[in-house]
């Protein structure tokens, strides 16, 4: 599946596959992954959005009995992606941590171990709304925290869509996009990469996150994640 960008503003997505989805923008190749991540092959850069580490701890602190283990599971998922794609740069498009109460001793220990496993990977956090409320991550986590939009090659890295104000091809998160599909008798909502007029919104990476159903407008499309398979939907479908 190719994302063809004939000018600075993206126009259309072509093709489909059951595994990884590749596209091109201004001579660069992007790969949508069924693990809810995006890989820029030439720059060996992995993008994710909305990890929400420590969300379960935040819920438990509020008296909601949510099981633990989601954060360590998600960090292991990230390790697999960084290793399998030999990434040298890791960009989080906002909301790495859920809130201030998420910074538990267990999360700190798990993230430090994760960082040690990937000590040679540059890690950039584009601050999202949850990151701003949670406060700065420990210095030992080794994150370069930046404000949006963060320019990286031809891309404007943001947390919230439209934060780049049309300055370039935008990569964003925040919305946790999903697409609702239905028959006459039943419906299903699946996470997706939402392709809009200014760029691409990534699905939430965190395993303990919700979804927001998007309605495709003319000219928009979605790369839908169904387990380990990806497929494309357009406004007309």
What are these regions (language model features)?
Residues 1-93, 98-237:
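Extended recognition/assembly regions associated with phosphoester-bond processing machinery
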């Amino acid at each position: 599946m190719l994302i063809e960008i004939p000018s600075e503003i993206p126009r259309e997505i072509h093709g489909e596959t059951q595994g990884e989805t590749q596209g091109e923008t201004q001579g660069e190749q992007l790969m949508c992954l069924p693990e809810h991540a995006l890989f820029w092959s030439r720059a060996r850069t992995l993008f994710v959005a909305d990890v929400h580490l420590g969300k379960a701890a935040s819920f438990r602190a509020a008296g909601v009995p949510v099981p633990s283990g989601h954060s360590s599971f998600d960090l292991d998922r990230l390790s697999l992606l960084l290793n399998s794609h030999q990434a040298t740069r890791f960009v989080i498009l906002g909301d790495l941590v859920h809130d201030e109460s998420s910074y538990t001793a267990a999360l700190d220990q798990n993230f430090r171990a994760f960082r040690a496993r990937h000590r040679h990977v540059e890690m950039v956090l584009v601050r999202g709304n949850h990151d701003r409320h949670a406060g700065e991550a420990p210095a030992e986590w080794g994150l370069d925290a930046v404000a949006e939009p963060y320019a990286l090659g031809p891309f404007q890295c943001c947390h919230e869509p439209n934060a780049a104000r049309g300055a370039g091809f935008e990569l964003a998160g925040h919305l946790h996009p999903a697409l609702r599909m239905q028959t006459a008798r039943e419906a299903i909502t699946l996470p997706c990469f939402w392709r809009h007029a200014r760029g691409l919104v990534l699905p939430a990476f965190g395993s303990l996150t919700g979804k927001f159903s998007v309605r495709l407008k003319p000219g928009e499309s979605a790369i839908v994640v169904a387990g380990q398979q990806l497929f494309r939907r357009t406004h007309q479908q």
